[in-house]
């Protein structure tokens, strides 16, 4: 939706009204939908620098970087608040002196207030169906209009860790929770005409009908070199109490399409923090299960890409991907049954990103969230490292091993 920018009197440039990204399954920072193939998130200069100096070998495993936009609050005639994005003019301040978005400061405050008080409502089910909306209205806009508050009852089930039914919602609650918390703080702490810088990134799930997404926090260490002692201790405690310490990886969120009941099964980071090693293995199994059967044909292409990523990470000397995540993505919509004598749908050659040799089923493996990534050559870096990231490699090796066990039926 294009709107007129009301941030400055006399400055009536066209803008894009942002929508919540309904397939966000983890993270604190609100991710917004810019268009069908693009999402945006508050700009962190370290992350922007990473994307702009990205090693060529890593590009296939990261979202495409599409630049930046400025974002401001916009109020429509009914008083409804939303975020509107405008392209950044070339004449604006250069990259090297850009400051952190005020939106990032709000996100960091949100981390402090929600970091340890997670809800026990860790499993949600939401139907992937059309909400009641006008022909030109997207599902995200209809959702915001029909459910303006987080605790508004709707259609789908949310359970606690004991399986008790406690709440019903019509959407994956995590992305909207991040969006509404972010919007509330922006509204209360900054004027309407305050401009914030956002990154534009590829929407890596846009090509999927029913995107199944697993968000994995990688590595044995999650705090950046610039973390305060309090934050460092908090992150070290989370790692020690989760599979991050013993496996180098933990679940930060996931959604899995259940074909039998036509809804997404959703779990959040609080669920992931409580898992044992065996619980982590069972969660990976569940991520590959559609409610009817295990999607075994996904295992080989996922393993193929993870091994390729492992090879790339081993070649990236000095890089430390602290607090970054790894997305595993596939389509919950299975290919149609083949006719007798026709090629198997999983054997058809694919040229799209994420395809594997031999025409393996389409999957995507993408690294995201580089706000705390460090490497030699980063501007004004005080701490540098030698060799590849041992914690990330440890996590990838264990992830591959567990998926191999599932593949072999153990």
From Swiss-Prot:
GO terms for molecular function: ATP binding; diphosphoinositol pentakisphosphate kinase activity; diphosphoinositol tetrakisphosphate kinase activity; inositol 5-diphosphate pentakisphosphate 5-kinase activity; inositol hexakisphosphate 5-kinase activity; inositol hexakisphosphate 6-kinase activity; inositol hexakisphosphate kinase activity; inositol-1,3,4,5,6-pentakisphosphate kinase activity. InterPro entries: IPK, IPK_sf. Keywords: ATP-binding, Cytoplasm, Kinase, Nucleotide-binding, Transferase. The keyword Cytoplasm applies. Substrate binds at residues 211-219. Converts inositol hexakisphosphate (InsP6) to diphosphoinositol pentakisphosphate (InsP7/PP-InsP5). Converts 1,3,4,5,6-pentakisphosphate (InsP5) to PP-InsP4. This is Inositol hexakisphosphate kinase 3. It comes from Homo sapiens (Human).
């Amino acid at each position: 939706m294009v709107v007129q920018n009301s941030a400055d009197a006399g400055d009536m440039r066209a803008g894009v009204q942002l929508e919540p990204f309904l397939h966000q399954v983890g993270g604190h920072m609100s991710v917004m939908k810019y268009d069908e193939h693009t999402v945006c998130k508050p700009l962190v200069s370290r992350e922007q620098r990473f994307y702009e100096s990205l090693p060529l070998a890593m590009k296939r495993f990261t979202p495409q970087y599409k630049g930046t936009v400025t974002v401001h609050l916009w109020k429509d005639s009914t008083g409804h608040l939303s975020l509107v994005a405008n392209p950044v003019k070339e004449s604006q301040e250069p990259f090297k002196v850009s400051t952190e978005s005020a939106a990032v400061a709000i996100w960091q405050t949100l981390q402090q207030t929600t970091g340890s008080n997670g809800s026990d409502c860790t499993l949600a089910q939401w139907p992937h169906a059309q909400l009641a909306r006008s022909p030109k209205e997207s599902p995200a806009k209809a959702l915001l209009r029909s459910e303006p508050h987080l605790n508004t009852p709707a259609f789908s089930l949310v359970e606690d860790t004991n399986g008790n039914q406690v709440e019903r919602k019509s959407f994956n609650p995590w992305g909207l929770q991040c969006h509404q918390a972010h919007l509330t703080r922006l509204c209360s702490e900054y004027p309407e005409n305050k401009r914030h810088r956002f990154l534009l990134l590829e929407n890596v799930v846009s090509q999927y009908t029913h995107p199944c997404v697993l968000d994995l926090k990688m590595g044995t260490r999650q705090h950046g070199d610039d973390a305060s002692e309090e934050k460092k201790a908090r992150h070290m405690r989370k790692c020690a109490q989760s599979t991050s310490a013993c496996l180098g990886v933990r679940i930060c969120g996931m959604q899995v399409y259940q074909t039998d009941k036509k809804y997404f099964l959703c779990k959040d980071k609080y669920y992931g923090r409580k898992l044992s090693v065996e619980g982590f293995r069972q969660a990976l199994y569940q991520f590959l299960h559609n409610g009817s059967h295990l999607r075994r044909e996904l295992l080989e292409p996922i393993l193929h890409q993870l091994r390729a990523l492992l090879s790339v990470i081993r070649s990236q000397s000095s890089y430390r991907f602290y607090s970054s995540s790894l997305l595993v993505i596939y389509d919950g919509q299975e290919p149609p049954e083949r006719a007798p004598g026709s090629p198997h749908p999983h054997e058809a050659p694919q040229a799209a990103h994420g395809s594997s040799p031999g025409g393996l089923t389409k999957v995507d493996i993408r690294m995201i969230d580089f706000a705390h990534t460090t490497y030699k050559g980063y501007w004004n870096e005080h701490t540098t490292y030698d060799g590849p990231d041992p914690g990330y490699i440890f996590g990838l090796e264990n992830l591959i091993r567990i998926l191999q066990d599932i593949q072999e039926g153990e």
